[in-house]
Curated annotation (Swiss-Prot):
Belongs to the glycosyl hydrolase 2 family. This is Beta-galactosidase. Binds 2 magnesium ions per monomer. Binds 1 sodium ion per monomer. Mg(2+) 1 binds at residues 417, 419, 462. One of its GO terms (biological process) is lactose catabolic process. The record marks 358, 392 as: Transition state stabilizer. NCBIfam families: PRK09525.1. Mg(2+) 2 binds at residue 598. GO terms for cellular component: beta-galactosidase complex. The gene is lacZ. Keywords: Glycosidase, Hydrolase, Magnesium, Metal-binding, Sodium. The active site is at 462 (proton donor), 538 (nucleophile). Its cofactor is Mg(2+); Na(+). Homotetramer.
Amino acid sequence: MTMITDSLAVVLQRRDWENPGVTQLNRLAAHPPFASWRNSEEARTDRPSQQLRSLNGEWRFAWFPAPEAVPESWLECDLPDADTVVVPSNWQMHGYDAPIYTNVTYPITVNPPFVPAENPTGCYSLTFNIDESWLQEGQTRIIFDGVNSAFHLWCNGRWVGYGQDSRLPSEFDLSAFLRAGENRLAVMVLRWSDGSYLEDQDMWRMSGIFRDVSLLHKPTTQISDFQVTTRFNDDFSRAVLEAEVQMYGELRDELRVTVSLWQGETQVASGTAPFGGEIIDERGGYADRVTLRLNVENPELWSAEIPNLYRAVVELHTADGTLIEAEACDVGFREVRIENGLLLLNGKPLLIRGVNRHEHHPLHGQVMDEQTMVQDILLMKQNNFNAVRCSHYPNHPLWYTLCDRYGLYVVDEANIETHGMVPMNRLTDDPRWLPAMSERVTRMVQRDRNHPSVIIWSLGNESGHGANHDALYRWIKSVDPSRPVQYEGGGADTTATDIICPMYARVDEDQPFPAVPKWSIKKWLSLPGEMRPLILCEYAHAMGNSLGGFAKYWQAFRQYPRLQGGFVWDWVDQSLIKYDENGNPWSAYGGDFGDTPNDRQFCMNGLVFADRTPHPALTEAKHQQQFFQFRLSGRTIEVTSEYLFRHSDNEFLHWMVALDGKPLASGEVPLDVGPQGKQLIELPELPQPESAGQLWLTVRVVQPNATAWSEAGHISAWQQWRLAENLSVTLPSASHAIPQLTTSGTDFCIELGNKRWQFNRQSGFLSQMWIGDEKQLLTPLRDQFTRAPLDNDIGVSEATRIDPNAWVERWKAAGHYQAEAALLQCTADTLADAVLITTAHAWQHQGKTLFISRKTYRIDGHGEMVINVDVAVASDTPHPARVGLTCQLAQVAERVNWLGLGPQENYPDRLTAACFDRWDLPLSDMYTPYVFPSENGLRCGTRELNYGPHQWRGDFQFNISRYSQQQLMETSHRHLLHAEEGTWLNIDGFHMGIGGDDSWSPSVSAEFQLSAGHYHYQLVWCQK
C-alpha cells in the first residue's frame, strides 16, 4: 500500500492528476463484480447480499473553482456552506459549473499531461455507521463504479487512495481506516486530469460521482478473481465450463473451491479441487489458483435470439465443507470465432444489427438507472437490433447483465479516445502513456470477461494507431483468445484489429483521404490479401431528419456474406433538460449552458429522442433489419427466416389485400419456419376489383404472445407489394354548371355556386379562395424550391465557418432562398365547361433566372381545380431541395387524412418502412419535433389528401403543420417555435432525399437528387 501523509496540502503538491504514470494509488486489482455471499443458495438465486451495502443517496457537497481552494478543515468536517446532492449524479446537473458539449476539440488547452489551474473541484462527504461485525474480521472495501475525472479519497481524515479512468470501478480497502460508530468519507473529485486527454469522446463533458458507490465486506481469506470460459466439441453437443479461481489471504491446505453449474433449480455439474494451479513453466504453477473443468452434455446455447443462461456458483470453503464465501455469475454457453473471413457465433455467421449507445439521460446527464437501461434494451429488441457498441467506454456494470439476460451482442470498448490530438496518435504512440492506456484496457477485460453478451473487445475510438494499440491487442489475444478484437483507428484495417471496422464508409463510393483512405465497403473486401470480415463500427449518421439511403447498406449486407452489418450512429439524442423563467422544461444542446468550445446540436444523432420517444428513422431501421424476408411469386409468398438459432414459435403471418386502403380480403397463417429456413404460403384467389385504385398486398408478422421484450401483438416484420390492377375508366359525371370568369383591374375571379377563386393578375398567383364567405387562404399559392435545412444539409457549416460544399450553402449562394418571382404570363380563358388560367414565372436572384415555372389551372363545373406545373431548372444552379407548391391555409383542422405512404414521416430515400394505406392522424402528429428545427413530416407516394374542407389528388408528397419553412429555418430550438395562424401546406411534385451516410458531407445519393432540367406534376384541388 502506498503511504502518503493525510494532509491535503501534500496531496495537492503531488499533483497526481498531471502525471500519466500515476493512474491510481492503492486501488485494488480489477475483477468481476463481487457480492461475497455467505450462503450458496443466495448466490445461486442472485439475492441481495448482506455483505454488499449501497452508499447511494444524499451526500454533502461543496464546489470549488480549483483544488487549491479547498480548505484543509474539510478533511475532518463538513463545510458550513456545503449543500446536499444525490449520489450518483453529475454536479453540472445540480447547477454547479456547466456541462460542455464538444466533439473533437478538447475542452481544455491541449498541453498533456497538464490541465488548467482553474480545475473545478467537487468535495463530497458522507457520514455512515458500519456493521461492527465487519470491524472484527475480514476486509471492508469501498467501490466507486464511476467518478469523472479523478479523485482522492479520505476516510476519517486519513488519506486512502487515488483513482482515475471515469468509466471503470475504483476499489479501495477501508479496513484499516474504519472505526466503531460513525465514519466519514471525504472524496475530492477533479474535473480535469491527465486522464481527460484519453477521454475526448463525442459527448457532454461532465463531472462527479456519477455511478454507484457501495461497501463490500469480504472475508480475510477470499475469492479474489474468477474467470469462466465455455469450450465445445465440433457440433456443440458437448461443452466444458472452465473456471479459473484465484484466492487472496492465508493459503491453507484445507481450502477448497467448488464450482457448481445450475440451470434454474437443477444442478447440471459440479466439481471441487484444492488450490494449486497447473504447471506453467519450469518453476511450477500458481499456488493461489485452481482451474476446474465441468463437462456439460447438450448445453442450451446462448445467443441474442435465445439467451439461455446458466448460473455458476463459486464457493470457497474448508475441507469439511464450511463455507467461507461464494461468488456467482450468469453463464452463457457460446463460442465466438472468425473463420474463413466470417464472424461466427456457435458456428453460424452473424449479421450485426447494431447501434452505438452513449449513456445519457435528459435529466440526470450520464447517470444510468436500471429502468432506463431496460427501456433501451426493450426498444432495441423491439426494433430488430441484436447488437450494441458501448460507445466509447465501458458501461455501467448492470448493463452487461441485462444484455446477457435479454439477449444483445455487445462490443465492449475501452475508455480511450484522443480525437483532438494532432496527430491523433500523439499519445497512443507514446510509451509514457502506455500504462494509462493499459489500465483502461486490461481492467475492462478483467471486469467484463464473464459476460456471454460481450463478443468483441474494442481498444477504444478515434485515437489513431500507435504502438500502444499493438501491445494491448496482443495482451488481449493472450489472456482472452475466445473473443476477437476490433479497433477502427489508423484506417480500420491495421494489425490491431481482427475485423475491418470502418466508420461511415460508403457502399460503392471510395473516400480517398490521405494516409487513411475509406474504401467502399464492397471494395474493401476485395483488397489483395484481405480476408477479414467487415463490420461498420459506425454508419448511417442519424442526426435529426436522417437515415436516408439506409436500405442500400442492407442490400449490400445481404448480398455479400463478409459484409456482416454494422452499428448505426447512434441510439439516443444527447439533449439535456433546462427550464425557462416560468419553470417550463426545454431541450438544450451544445452552447446552451454558455459552454465553450461547443459543437452545437451535433450531440443529437439518435434514433430516439433523449426521452426515448422514437424518431421516424427508427422504423426504417426496424424494417431493414427485420429477421423475416419475403418474396411474392404469383399467389405464393416465400418467407425466409434470418434467425440463426430460433424456430418460429410465436409468429403468425397476417396478410391483407386492400384497394386504396379499403380491405378486400385477409387471412392469417401460423409461421413454422426453422433457423435460416423457408416457408411457402399459398394465398387464395385474390379479388380483382372493378373500380379504379391502387391494389396492395400487405403482410405482417405478428407475435400473438408477449415475450420478455415485447407485448402481445408485437409486429416484427412487414412487406407490401403493389398488385396488378384491371384497367378501368371512371367517366366524369356531367355538370350543367359552368364557372363564371370576371376580370377586375387586378384580379381574375372565378365563381361557381358558393365557391370563388381569385388570381392576382400582377403576381400571377392564386391569391384567395372562398367557400361561402369564408376565406380559405392566408397566403397565395406559390412555387417552392427550398426546405428548412436539415442537419445533413448544413454539414459542418457554422456562422463563423462556412462550408461552401454544404447543400444549404450552395442554395444560399445561388439565391434559392432569396429568389423572387418575375411574372411572365397571366391569362384567363373561358372554355366550354371550364375556366383556364395560365401563368408563367421566372424565379430570379440578382438578375439571374434560377427556375421557370409554367402552370395551368383548370376549374371545371364540379369545382375541381386541376393544376399542371412545368418547371425548368437552370443548368448552372444547384439541384433544388424540392419542386412544389406552398400556401398557408386559413383553417386549423384537428385531423389529417391521406391515401399514401405512412403513417410515419418518410422521404424518397427513407420510405421502405412506410406502407400504402389510408391514414388518419391528428395534425400535431404530422410534425416531427426535432430539437433543432428543420424540414420534417413529409409523406411520400400520396394519391389523396383531405384536410378540413379541402381535398388534393394526384401523385405527390406533402407536409402540413402549424410552422412555416421560414420559421423552421430561423429557429434554433423546438421550444421556441410558435404555432402560426392557420396551417402551412407544402405539396411537392418532387423532393430531394435527405441523406445520412454521414452528416458532414453532402451524402444524398445521386439517384435521390433533383438533377433533371425539367419537372412536371399535376394536382387536383377541390372542396368536399
